[in-house]
Amino acid sequence: GFCGETLSDHEDTLSVMRAVGYDYAYMFQYSERPGTLAALKYPDDIPAEEKTRRLNEIIALQNELSLESNRRDVGKTFKVLVEGPSRRDPADSCGRASNNKMCVFPAAVPEKGLSDCKAGDYVNVKVLSCTSATLICERV
């Protein structure tokens, strides 16, 4: 919903997203910021409800694209930089692979001789499943 964006412009954005197939994206609703060129030169002429509708459409499409991308990683092995404990389960750790995708995996696997990992460690993981935002992994 940038100033002056038409429905055709918005559809073009969705079309580019489909064509490129981004793994992930940072998506925000436009809001005027004092002192910027846009605030000085362009009237904020897109209604808030329309900005929200367009953003929700972009987010829904990106969630589909991210899930497709993450599904292609199932079965692959990655070296992951551990960031710390998972927010959902303290027995799990989370970190990012070299492709910047978030991975969640057991912090320790005693039966495999894999000790507890901590932030800053590198661990090898294999992707078992995924969501649109996360690769669910096992330590290898």
Region locations from a protein language model:
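Conserved C-terminal portion of the radical SAM core fold
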Residues: 1-36, 57-65
